[in-house]
Amino acid sequence: MNPILKGVYSPARLGVVALTLFGILGVTGCSTAVDETQRAWMNKIFRPYVPDVVQGNFISSEQYAKLQLGMTREQVRQIMGTPLLASYFHANRWDYVFEFKRSGQTVGKERHVTVFFDGDKVVKFEGDALPTEVELVAEIDNYSKSKRSFWEVITDTNKLPVTPPLQQPEVLVTSKTDNLPAGAAVPAANTSGSFWDFFGSSKKDPDPQSPQLGPGTLNDVPKPADSK
């Protein structure tokens, strides 16, 4: 081998080069992990502005109550507006769909109202349970109160209360006397002492039994103890 190349490809130099490459790869991997963490944190805090979106026609219960059979299409349009869905293949049907979104999230639920015509006259109309204008404002307001501000997200405060899970009911242990037939003798209770009863600190003396009194014993006067 050429003496010059022999010095270049020496084991010591190759080891240094290998360690350098491994170090560069490790630093690159760590920086990538840090960048991903920072990006996730920034996306959580600094969210792009998303305007409120109202899709369709808001139909309140007050508007729905004004519909009557026999109305013309123009009268329906004046009350409820131009329908969101008016198919060319279903000219006798107008579909009103309403949905409200705030910050990309749906507030409330999607509601539908359908009006059927025969020519230019209303013959039928149906729809979901519709809120009043006051109820819709309250529904949107409750959603706004559930959202946290920028500072609350940073400080991790003002979280919504978490409902604790329901406690599981206790399992009842079946008694030994539940399945006994009528008139059967009840088994005696276990009166054996426990392990700690063998020690003097926990062993209790049995209660002194009262003397059994026979006939005439209540009239006997106890004798004084002999003095020594």
Swiss-Prot record:
A lipid is attached at C30 (S-diacylglycerol cysteine). It is found in: Cell outer membrane. Keywords: Cell outer membrane, Lipoprotein, Membrane, Palmitate, Signal. GO terms for cellular component: Bam protein complex. Transmembrane segments: none annotated. A lipid is attached at C30 (N-palmitoyl cysteine). It is a lipid-anchor. Its main location: membrane. Residues 1-29 form the signal peptide. Coiled coil: none annotated. Belongs to the BamE family. This is Outer membrane protein assembly factor BamE. The gene is bamE.
